[in-house]
Design a protein with these regions (language model features):
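Bacterial N-terminal signal peptides
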Residues: 8-17
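Bacterial N-terminal signal peptides that target proteins for export
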Residues: 1-9
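Surface-exposed, well-ordered secondary-structure segments
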Residues: 21-182
Length: 182
């Protein structure tokens, strides 16, 4: 191999590594179990998937109960989604990334009429982007499945939070797609 072709090979390899490092990562919660081993509902304080740690943004302020997440099944598809298990106190769900990411797209489903908010934060806890809906898409007819919808935020993102449901409502994240910063 000549020096020029060796250098060309190394540059090609470096370019391929650069492109691969920015590939989109997908989380789908399909490894979550509908019931825990003891038969109890699937409420957890923390969930980790592909290095992303899901928690509530803060502990409950209106009760002494432990803040928990839950996995919720979309009836029409069987897909599993993650949501706040706090039915009487709306607490945002937080997803913290192991390294900064440049964009996050979440596929959600929710109670009819629920507002939805997706916020992106940098490592200094500053909001860098926000997406919101005053009311999520609803069913066209009563027999239709609850529809999915997407929300996207961009920036130098350390973590995101999603929220919006009022007492008794839910907002479930079906799939989280993110692109690591290069």
């Amino acid at each position: 191999m000549t020096r020029a072709s060796g250098l060309s090979f190394l540059l090609s390899l470096a370019a391929a590594a650069y492109v691969c490092s920015a590939e989109e990562v997908v989380l789908d919660f399909e490894n979550a179990v509908p019931l825990l081993a003891d038969g109890q509902a699937n409420r957890v304080a923390q969930w980790e998937e592909k290095g992303v740690v899901f928690t509530l943004a803060h502990e409950p302020r209106q009760s002494k109960g432990k803040g928990l997440l839950m996995f919720f099944t979309h009836l029409a598809t069987g897909n599993k989604g993650i949501a706040s298990a706090m039915a009487t106190e709306s607490i945002p769900v937080r997803a913290a990334f192991p390294k900064p990411v440049s964009s996050v797209t979440i596929s959600f489903w929710a109670s009819t009429g629920t507002p939805a908010l997706l916020e992106a934060f940098d490592a200094s806890d500053n909001v860098v982007d926000r997406a919101s809906l005053p009311s999520v898409p609803g069913r066209k007819t009563p027999g239709d499945p609850v529809p999915f919808f997407n929300m996207t935020v961009k920036g130098s993102i350390a973590y995101i939070q999603f929220s919006g449901p009022r007492e008794g409502e839910y907002l479930a994240a079906d799939e989280v797609r993110f692109t690591p910063l290069r």
